[in-house]
């Protein structure tokens, strides 16, 4: 008989019991030591794979970042297209601030395998400058001259120095000339490539699902092997679309989608959905009314302007229209200081009446007519 077995069988019942207890303690303590060593010295690293489904209300219209003007299109475009600044290996600004020399990274390619060169960048700039395209980037690129230095180099010339022009470069998405170059500007928004995009971002278009009534229910994207940046870990990225808040709510409740993002208030409470965490992220957007004193002489009067400001109940707008998902801003731009932001409002109905009446008394009850112009969205 094996000596170890002989010793074990020579144990009494009590000795065997204590042997197993000691063995269990040894195993548990060893596992605990290993776990502690991993926790203190190990490095957690993500692995590639899996899928993610993002829910959206509404429909994609044009997954083309230089014509997109709605949040759905813009968010989808952000995973398909790269911004100009992210494609650069270097840039130089002239001492007078009017010339920018840009150099692209070597070996850039679109997700269909075609080379991405300075021709694509120049084509993008000239396209956004074309008024027939109606690009939201048009104003920020007006008057900018773009010249080809080489396959990788672009020279930009500004009519006047603009200290924030580098931000224009950082935010400009680049579109492929070999896809859109032959499309007339008047048909630019009608191209099928706006729904089957070719880009250079972290993900590339694979397919979409459309119902018989024309409603697009899902987009499917996969990692772009030609992406110049850090490769994404998620293997399959889906965008799922819903016609109303109730459908989105039910999909979230059944875990048919992993999450959603919305800049507009929704008709349901997320606290009623098990396993869902709500994260509120501040967005660099604001709603404001600007006084155009040139188009309406009435607005040159300080009492009128102050009266209009006092007459607007910002807190009620935040609570009733935006569902409390906003902060009151009392000055242009953004700041984290309490004097600029917070829940304080200039609303004072009595003061507004006094200011308006002071103007009317001064101007012999002159009628007050003001036109409010809003963007078409």
Model-based region annotation:
Residues 91-134, 147-157, 251-254, 298, ...:
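Aromatic- and charge-enriched surface segment that lines or borders ligand/interaction sites
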Residues 33-36, 136-184:
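Surface-exposed binding/hinge segments that line
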Residues 215-223, 300-377:
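Append "and occasionally in soluble cytosolic enzymes with long acidic Gly/Pro-rich linkers
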Residues 56-74, 114, 164-175, 290, ...:
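A structural "hinge/loop" feature
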Residues 49-59, 99-102, 124, 154-156, ...:
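Short, well-ordered beta-strand elements
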Residues 172-231, 236, 246, 354:
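Gly/Pro-rich hinge or "lid" segments in bacterial periplasmic/extracellular proteins
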Residues 55-97, 103, 126, 198-200:
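N-terminal lobe/hinge region of extracytoplasmic solute-binding protein
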Residues 224-270:
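Ligand-site clamp/hinge motif
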């Amino acid at each position: 008989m094996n000596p170890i077995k002989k010793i074990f069988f020579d144990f009494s019942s009590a000795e065997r019991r204590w042997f197993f207890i000691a063995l269990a303690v040894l195993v548990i303590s060893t596992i605990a030591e290993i776990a502690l060593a991993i926790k203190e010295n190990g490095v957690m690293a993500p692995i590639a794979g899996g899928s993610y489904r993002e829910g959206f209300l509404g429909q994609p219209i044009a997954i083309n970042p230089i014509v997109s003007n709605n949040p759905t299109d813009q968010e989808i475009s952000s995973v398909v297209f790269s911004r100009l600044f992210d494609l650069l290996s270097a840039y130089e600004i002239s001492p007078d601030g009017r010339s920018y020399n840009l150099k692209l990274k070597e070996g850039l390619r679109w997700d269909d395998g075609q080379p991405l060169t300075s021709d694509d960048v120049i084509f993008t700039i000239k396209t956004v400058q074309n008024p027939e395209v109606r690009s939201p980037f048009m104003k920020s690129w007006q008057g900018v001259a773009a010249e080809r230095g080489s396959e990788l180099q672009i020279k930009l010339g500004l009519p006047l120095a603009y200290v924030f022009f580098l931000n224009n470069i950082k935010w400009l998405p680049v579109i492929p000339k070999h896809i859109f170059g032959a499309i007339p500007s008047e048909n630019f928004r009608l191209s099928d490539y706006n729904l089957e995009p070719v880009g250079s971002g972290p993900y590339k278009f694979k397919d979409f699902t459309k119902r018989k009534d024309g409603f697009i229910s899902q987009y499917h994207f996969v990692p772009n092997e030609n992406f110049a940046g850090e490769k994404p870990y998620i293997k399959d990225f889906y965008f799922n679309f819903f016609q109303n808040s109730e459908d989105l709510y039910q999909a979230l409740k059944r875990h048919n989608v992993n999450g959603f993002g919305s800049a507009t208030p929704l008709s349901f409470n997320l606290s009623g959905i098990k396993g869902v965490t709500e994260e509120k992220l501040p967005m660099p957007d604001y709603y404001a009314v600007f006084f155009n004193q040139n188009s309406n002489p009435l607005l040159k009067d300080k009492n009128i302007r102050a009266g209009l400001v006092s007459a607007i109940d910002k807190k009620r707008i935040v609570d009733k229209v935006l569902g409390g998902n906003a902060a009151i801003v009392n000055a242009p731009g953004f700041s984290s200081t309490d004097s600029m932001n917070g829940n304080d409002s200039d609303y004072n109905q009595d003061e507004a009446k006094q200011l308006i009446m002071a103007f009317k008394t001064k101007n012999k009850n002159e009628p007050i007519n003001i036109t409010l112009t809003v963007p078409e969205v």
